[in-house]
């Protein structure tokens, strides 16, 4: 963030907030564990020190650090002190965290500041932490930073004619380079397991890049569908759902994937898709079905809960309609789908899309570049890979 403020002629206002747990984080304990693992990988790629002084952050001093930072709220020193506290906390510097925590003039001072910040964020239309907001649009973490920098570049408000090397390196790190032909070493790799929900726009978007990566390396993709979160007893509040759809639309435009006319398949539509998928798999048409069903749901507003809609999708896949109807009448699919959910949860993920390749587990459609990087590393025998 300091580099962003230095490179562009912008005014940056930093707010101390916290992520809302109730309803917005369906598996908070799992999220904490996964987030640390994910941030370790990101920090390694971006060259940022992360938990290099301890295995875990000093959570016992989190409240004290927040109170110490809150003491400078409203002053020019606030953002600098907040950035310093964040670095200390997420590098695992227990000694420094203890010292700053003791310096807090008033215990509980952060609570009032956080409440004000949360109220502002809610009025602006969001609920999560690590969010940037500019002129009506939200940008989450480093994964959406390129949208903001593109917007600022288009406005011509850069202070320098040369790009900021640090900001540029983040963009470069997340680019995918694929081999012109599958390397020999890829033949020994296991299948990519892809946990998918027909109600998840991110699942639909990530299918395309996952298949592209797998095809480039000659690796099979095993689609493992699960029920939508709301059909598994996990809440998806309105503001979260609205942001997801807006963000997915933005991502779809960037990737050139059809998106926008939506028919929510929750309930009967999702169940029918799951049943038909297993039939499609038995006919070697699983890949075709998830792609066509996704396009129908997320870009053509096809109602897959109806026979007319489902017939439209399955016709494109070359599936026999009488057999499709028979598949939708049974309940045999439920055990397989539940097994997929259990497997995903055992690996430390609760949401989709989740990708597993051996011991690597990635959550989110914006980790496709990390999957490609991991496969490249597994295939690198020292002779290099032609990309």
Regions found by a protein language model. Name each.
Residues 185-188, 269:
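Short, flexible turn/loop "capping" segments at secondary-structure junctions
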Residues 187-202:
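Short active-site neighborhood of thiol/selenol oxidoreductases, capturing the structured segment around
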Residues 1-6, 84-181, 191, 205-213, ...:
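C-terminal cap of thioredoxin/glutaredoxin-like
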Residues 1-88, 204-297, 382-386:
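Structural alpha/beta surface segment adjacent to cysteine/selenocysteine redox centers
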Residues 27, 136, 184, 198, ...:
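Conserved aromatic-histidine-acidic binding/catalytic patches
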Residues 55-58, 103, 195-199, 263-267, ...:
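Conserved strand-turn element in the central/C-terminal portion of the radical SAM core barrel
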């Amino acid at each position: 963030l300091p580099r962003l403020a230095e490179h562009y002629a912008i005014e940056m206002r930093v707010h101390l907030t916290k992520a809302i747990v109730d309803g917005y984080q369906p598996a908070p304990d799992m999220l904490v564990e996964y987030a640390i693992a994910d941030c370790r990988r990101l920090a390694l790629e971006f060259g940022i020190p992360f938990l290099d002084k301890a295995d875990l952050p000093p959570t016992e001093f989190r409240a004290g650090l927040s109170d110490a930072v809150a003491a400078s709220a409203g002053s020019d020193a606030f953002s600098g002190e907040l950035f310093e506290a964040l670095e200390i906390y997420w590098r695992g510097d227990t000694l420094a965290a203890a010292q700053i925590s003791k310096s807090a003039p008033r215990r509980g001072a952060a609570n009032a500041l956080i409440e004000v910040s949360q109220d502002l964020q809610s009025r602006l239309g969001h609920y999560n932490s690590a969010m940037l907001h500019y002129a009506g649009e939200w940008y989450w973490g480093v994964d959406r930073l390129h949208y903001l920098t593109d917007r600022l570049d288009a406005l011509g408000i850069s202070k320098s004619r040369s790009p900021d090397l640090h900001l540029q390196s983040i963009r470069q790190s997340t680019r995918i380079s694929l081999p012109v032909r599958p390397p020999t070493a890829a033949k020994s790799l296991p299948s990519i397991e892809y946990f998918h929900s027909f109600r998840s726009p991110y699942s639909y978007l990530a299918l395309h890049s996952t298949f592209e990566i797998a095809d480039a390396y000659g690796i099979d993709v095993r689609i493992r569908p699960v029920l939508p979160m709301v059909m598994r007893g996990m809440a998806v509040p309105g503001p979260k759902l609205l942001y997801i759809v807006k963000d997915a639309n933005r991502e779809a435009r960037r990737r050139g994937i059809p998106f926008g006319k939506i028919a929510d398949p929750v309930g009967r539509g999702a169940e029918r898709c799951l049943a038909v998928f297993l039939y499609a798999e038995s006919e070697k048409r699983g890949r075709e079905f998830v792609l066509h069903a996704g396009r129908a749901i997320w870009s053509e507003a096809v109602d897959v809960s109806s026979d007319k809609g489902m017939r439209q999708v399955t016709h494109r896949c070359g599936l026999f309609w009488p057999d499709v109807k028979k598949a939708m009448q049974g309940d045999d699919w439920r055990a397989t789908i539940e097994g997929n959910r259990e497997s995903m949860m055992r690996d430390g993920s609760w949401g989709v899309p989740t990708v597993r390749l051996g011991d690597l587990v990635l959550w989110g459609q914006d980790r496709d570049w990390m999957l490609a990087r991991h496969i490249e590393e597994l295939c690198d025998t020292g002779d290099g890979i032609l990309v």
